[in-house]
């Protein structure tokens, strides 16, 4: 008996929608990362993109526990000397809702071409509407 290896042509990518209202950032991110990789499927193969498309709505209503809304820092750099910028979770959610979730999920995915392809299947929206109704996404409860 040979080891099963999924072929890219035989993988079916489904669409799911997650409502992030009053959900904890890390718990949503870990479930999203698992489904983007395809590890919930029996045909999971590490070198093939077997994951599904995930649409997250109400990302502006995500929360973190404890004092992380002030203590959790996000860093970025302009590329110039002294060009480091720091922001906390509360300010990032106010200015760019959903970016914290995007960064959390990206950190949980593999680095390299396959991981970059996986993160493109994540669609995050601040409000409760999304333009992916034509794909008929299934509701996913976390």
From Swiss-Prot:
Domain of life of the organism encoding this protein: Bacteria
Protein name in the entry: Large ribosomal subunit protein uL13
Intrachain disulfide bonds: none
GO molecular function: mRNA binding; structural constituent of ribosome
Main function: This protein is one of the early assembly proteins of the 50S ribosomal subunit, although it is not seen to bind rRNA by itself. It is important during the early stages of 50S assembly.
Cellular-component GO terms for this entry: cytosolic large ribosomal subunit
Family the UniProt entry places it in: Belongs to the universal ribosomal protein uL13 family.
GO terms, biological process: negative regulation of translation; translation
Keywords: Ribonucleoprotein, Ribosomal protein
Keyword rRNA-binding: no
PANTHER family named in the record: LARGE RIBOSOMAL SUBUNIT PROTEIN UL13M (PTHR11545:SF2), RIBOSOMAL PROTEIN L13 (PTHR11545)
Subunit details: Part of the 50S ribosomal subunit.
Organism in which the protein naturally occurs: Leptothrix cholodnii (strain ATCC 51168 / LMG 8142 / SP-6) (Leptothrix discophora (strain SP-6))
Entry keyword annotation includes Transport: no
Gene transcribed to yield this protein: rplM
């Amino acid at each position: 008996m040979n080891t099963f290896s999924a072929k890219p042509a035989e993988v079916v990518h489904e669409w799911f929608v997650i409502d992030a209202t009053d959900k904890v950032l890390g718990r949503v991110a870990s479930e999203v990362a698992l489904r983007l990789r395809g590890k919930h499927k029996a045909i999971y193969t590490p070198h093939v993109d077997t994951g599904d498309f995930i649409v997250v709505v109400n990302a502006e209503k995500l929360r973190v526990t404890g004092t992380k809304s002030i203590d959790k820092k996000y860093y970025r750099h302009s590329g110039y000397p002294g060009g480091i910028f720091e922001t906390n979770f509360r300010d990032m959610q106010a200015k760019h809702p959903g970016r914290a979730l995007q960064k959390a999920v990206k950190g949980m995915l593999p680095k390299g071409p396959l991981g970059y392809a996986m993160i493109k299947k994540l669609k995050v929206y601040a409000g409760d509407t999304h333009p992916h109704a034509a794909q008929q996404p299934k509701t996913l409860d976390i």
